[in-house]
Design a protein with these regions (language model features):
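Carboxylate-rich, polar loop motifs that coordinate divalent cations or form catalytic acidic clusters
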Residues: 1-177
Length: 177
């Protein structure tokens, strides 16, 4: 990684907070948490490594967190409320700003399709507080409702399966303002 003060490249093994780690899986996604300053590294088959200057790196996996649906992390997104959304090769989860974890299980769409396994590639939240997911296998998924009240969640799918898109593979998504 690049050292901010000097601009020089530094191997992670030479960063004190990373000492003790033998090796790291391939990096897939990264985000810096706005309030805490933590940097979350989403890894291919390695979960999430949480870096906070001056502290030993924390390693989050499906075994020690309630929001990871798979250890293959493919997308990270922090919304304006401070909730950190995590897309994986297997689903979507969120660590709320208050530390509460939520894992999305089966999503039932209003056109009788359902999804228990999705490969999330990108995540964005719009001004209406809706979450949009780009997926490799189910096109775009639109989530409305309050994640703090799971019974209010509703899901809509835009994909080749329901003829709302010409493909099921969507790699990124952007909010047009």
């Amino acid at each position: 990684c690049r050292e901010y003060e000097t601009g020089k490249l530094k191997m992670y093994s030479h960063i004190p907070e990373f000492s003790g780690l033998k090796d790291l899986p391939s990096l897939f996604a990264v985000t810096q948490r706005k309030k805490s300053g933590e940097i979350w590294f989403g890894m291919y088959n390695g979960g999430i490594y949480v870096y906070r200057k001056g502290e030993k790196v924390k390693h989050l996996t499906t075994k020690n967190s309630g929001f990871l649906t798979s250890d293959c992390v493919s997308a990270l997104y922090e919304d304006y409320e401070g909730n950190c959304w995590v897309g994986t090769r297997g689903g979507i989860g969120v660590r709320l700003a208050d530390g509460t974890d939520y894992r999305f299980e089966t999503m039932n769409f209003n056109d009788s399709l359902s999804a228990g396994w999705i490969y999330v590639r990108d995540i964005i939240k719009d001004m209406d507080n809706s979450v949009w997911l780009a997926t490799s296998n189910l096109g775009v998924i639109h989530i409305t409702g309050d994640v703090r009240q799971p019974s209010t969640l509703k899901y809509e799918n835009y994909s080749f399966h329901n003829r709302k898109l010409i493909t099921n593979t969507v790699l990124c998504i952007h909010l047009d303002r």
